[in-house]
């Protein structure tokens, strides 16, 4: 099945591909889209296979490497030789895998609350989420989602927005089998021993109050990668690109401006 993707901005702009986390939706990046376009970038966003407008039944053995191949398919379809890949959580894992498998296609990486190997805390969180899905079904699963994504104070302050997001997530839930396959893929991901082989300049961004992925996972990425800019926020939660969008966008644009080669479109 073909993947749904969107291309925004000038044809000659530096290409930035946005890869979402577990939810898989291109819409996750709405807080970044305007800033990237204003900076002159050509922006590619997509719904990951088995989510949103890219419907598919995922096999139990579906892996991050399969998701990286999907990105190659999108780059080929959009005549994009290489891109700056911005990935949130699972999307960051896709970027790391792509940088290992197809290094010529990756101009730079931006890894937002990502990781290089499993950790016990995140495993416990995903165990709880799967148990909720198994025992109570999709509605309970999506009702709990904001607890893992956002700080409590932000959820309280933006209660209606959170409620609307939950309703939308339930209406577009990809199915229990697909969700289990996607969680299985991110839980199996472990390229920690290969971090040193990644040469693409990388921005590692994390919020230190992330309740799902410890900030130490981002520190580990920074320690293992060769060419790293590290940006920690004291707060913002797992989706700090949403809750602290202005701060995140400044860091993102500064990094992209620094690593973009003048006159050489990505």
Swiss-Prot record:
<dbReference type="GO" id="GO:0016020">
    <property type="term" value="C:membrane"/>
</dbReference>
<dbReference type="GO" id="GO:0019740">
    <property type="term" value="P:nitrogen utilization"/>
</dbReference>
<dbReference type="InterPro" id="IPR000073">
    <property type="entry name" value="AB_hydrolase_1"/>
</dbReference>
<keyword id="KW-0378">Hydrolase</keyword>
<comment type="function">
    <text>Involved in pyrimidine catabolism. May facilitate the hydrolysis of carbamate, a reaction that can also occur spontaneously.</text>
</comment>
<dbReference type="GO" id="GO:0016811">
    <property type="term" value="F:hydrolase activity, acting on carbon-nitrogen (but not peptide) bonds, in linear amides"/>
</dbReference>
<dbReference type="InterPro" id="IPR019913">
    <property type="entry name" value="Pyrimidine_utilisation_RutD"/>
</dbReference>
<dbReference type="GO" id="GO:0046464">
    <property type="term" value="P:acylglycerol catabolic process"/>
</dbReference>
<dbReference type="InterPro" id="IPR029058">
    <property type="entry name" value="AB_hydrolase_fold"/>
</dbReference>
<protein>
    <recommendedName>
        <fullName>Putative carbamate hydrolase RutD</fullName>
        <ecNumber>3.5.1.-</ecNumber>
    </recommendedName>
</protein>
<comment type="similarity">
    <text>Belongs to the AB hydrolase superfamily. Hydrolase RutD family.</text>
</comment>
<dbReference type="GO" id="GO:0047372">
    <property type="term" value="F:monoacylglycerol lipase activity"/>
</dbReference>
<dbReference type="GO" id="GO:0006212">
    <property type="term" value="P:uracil catabolic process"/>
</dbReference>
<dbReference type="Pfam" id="PF00561">
    <property type="entry name" value="Abhydrolase_1"/>
</dbReference>
<dbReference type="InterPro" id="IPR050266">
    <property type="entry name" value="AB_hydrolase_sf"/>
</dbReference>
<feature type="domain" description="AB hydrolase-1">
    <location>
        <begin position="15"/>
        <end position="128"/>
    </location>
</feature>
